[in-house]
């Protein structure tokens, strides 16, 4: 039997369709995974078509974008860089990183944050999405160490969900990385992923460090994951990812009443004819809930929002919030947060997030 839950599928599609219309986006996708079994519970794409009505068919509408389309993830990749830094033993969540004036000169290039933030702890680098802080950590690691965490998290390999034409993305051999490439890859540029790959990769933060195999078929029994991180690293990452959805983070709009949500925003300029387009964005959010013992992973991509807002925390996080809110209720997942949701402050611009 298929693992797709029809209630969650409809919920994901409804929220995605509304967000794509609201933000005048070119397209969008949502993936909902069972964080304990790796089962795909929902897989929605917009635009789409009804296979019973061939008159509106065109190949662009029929594509399962979440599985076959690739994008540069931007800041949704930062947790994997920070996890590699924690794994090295040289950093803890409280280690202070100097982000100076929000600029890190590297030869002819400069890594920039949108807003200068001064000294930040590792946890704050993640919460505020600092490119400079993330790049500094990445550059202190041997390239192979960063590559090992990315590769073992499933990047650069087909996820094998059981769908024809799945994309494997691009993760280059670390022997070929120049320092500037290692720096930009640390915050999700120069690497390409599918939304399914990204959703699956976040399973390492749900399972105490194991990467789950994903499937479109119901699983009769529990599956073994592949170890990627030490359990203490995975738990530390989950704690830090909760800061992202709290005031001071980039995604308070991902909050869900009664549940702790951990997650990360991404806002990446898109490549057009080999150059980054200043006004075309891939805006994303990946959320885990309840964060105390995750049951669901929801990944959202809004492609080329053009109605004014473009940060992942503005356009993708609210979709994840709505999908999680409905899905947790449908699945009767007990709340892990006693307090009612407080009024959400306006989303802060990420410190970094864009390049």
Question: Residue spans of the language-model regions?
Answer:
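Extracytoplasmic/periplasmic proteins that interact with beta-lactams or build/remodel peptidoglycan
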Residues: 1-28, 49-52, 57-61, 325-329, ...
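Short amphipathic alpha-helical signal-transduction/dimerization elements
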Residues: 206, 245, 321-328, 332
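Generic non-transmembrane alpha-helical segments
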Residues: 15-19, 84, 149, 240, ...
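Amphipathic oligomerization regions
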Residues: 305, 309-326
């Amino acid at each position: 039997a298929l693992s797709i839950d029809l209630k969650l599928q409809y919920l994901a599609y409804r929220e995605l369709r509304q967000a794509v219309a609201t933000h005048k986006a070119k397209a969008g996708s949502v993936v909902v995974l069972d964080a304990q079994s790796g089962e795909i519970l929902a897989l929605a794409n917009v635009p789409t078509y009804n296979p019973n009505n061939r008159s509106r068919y065109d190949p662009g509408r029929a594509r399962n974008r979440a599985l076959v389309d690739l994008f540069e993830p931007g800041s949704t990749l930062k947790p994997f860089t920070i996890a590699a830094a924690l794994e090295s033993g040289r950093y803890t969540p409280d280690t202070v990183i100097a982000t100076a004036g929000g600029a890190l000169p590297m030869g002819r290039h400069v890594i920039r944050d949108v807003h200068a933030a001064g000294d930040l702890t590792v946890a704050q680098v993640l919460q505020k999405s600092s490119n400079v802080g993330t790049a500094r950590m990445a550059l202190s690691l041997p390239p192979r160490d960063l590559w090992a965490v990315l590769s073992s998290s499933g990047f650069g390999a087909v996820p094998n969900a059981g769908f024809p034409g799945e994309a494997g993305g691009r993760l280059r051999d670390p022997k070929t990385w120049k320092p500037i490439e290692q720096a930009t890859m640390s915050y999700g540029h120069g690497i390409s992923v599918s939304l399914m790959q990204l959703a699956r990769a976040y399973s390492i933060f749900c399972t105490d460090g194991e990467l789950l195999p994903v499937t479109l078929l119901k699983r009769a029994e529990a599956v073994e994951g592949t170890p990627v991180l030490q359990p203490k690293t995975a738990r530390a990452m989950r704690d830090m990812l909760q800061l992202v959805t709290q005031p001071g983070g980039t995604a308070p709009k991902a909050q869900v009443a009664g549940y702790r949500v951990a997650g990360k925003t991404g806002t990446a300029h898109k490549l057009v004819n080999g150059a980054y387009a200043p006004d075309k964005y891939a805006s994303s959010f990946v959320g885990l809930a309840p964060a105390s013992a995750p049951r669901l992973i929801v990944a959202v991509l809004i492609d080329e929002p053009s109605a004014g807002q473009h940060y992942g925390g503005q356009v993708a996080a609210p979709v994840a919030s709505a999908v999680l809110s409905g899905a947790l209720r449908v699945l009767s997942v007990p709340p892990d947060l006693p307090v009612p949701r407080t009024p959400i402050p306006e989303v802060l611009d990420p410190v970094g997030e864009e390049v």
